[in-house]
């Protein structure tokens, strides 16, 4: 009862909000491996559109210019996909939610097929795609994760990523632009 009242009061005062944790993986911290995971491969727009699993195929629009996509297959069947954005595409589409410097990219989306959830597919894909991005010269990778999505936190943390910030956007009094507040959580950018 009190929780619902508090939520209503917060919405009245702050308007719509977003709350994301920012995760970071530096190239030096990327998991070292002599052998890449053979089940994680780069994938392009055409490959994504051809996927049989609609939960994965419907995210094909995330691929393209300034995007690097990877697909994890389990027993020969695509189980998860992820997309890193950088450059102009990231700046244009994300409203610079988290600023990126050169040689930095943001993991914009990761999707796991419902049949593969709870089996470590996301963790494997996050870890291996980060390793491959680092090997390709990307120095720092970021991702934003909704504040209450515990399964995503766990996947990133098991993959070796560190939570570095909390970003809140609030829109008090229905302003034209929301206020964005960034709180560091113990690691410099």
Where are the predicted features?
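Conserved catalytic-core motifs of GNAT/GCN5-like acyltransferases
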Residues: 18-23, 162-176
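Conserved beta-strand segments that form the floor/walls of ligand-binding pockets within enzyme
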Residues: 71, 106, 111
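Conserved acetyl-CoA-binding loop-helix of GNAT-fold acetyltransferases
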Residues: 109-112, 118-135, 140, 154-158
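Conserved active-site alpha-helix within GNAT-family acetyltransferase domains
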Residues: 147-165
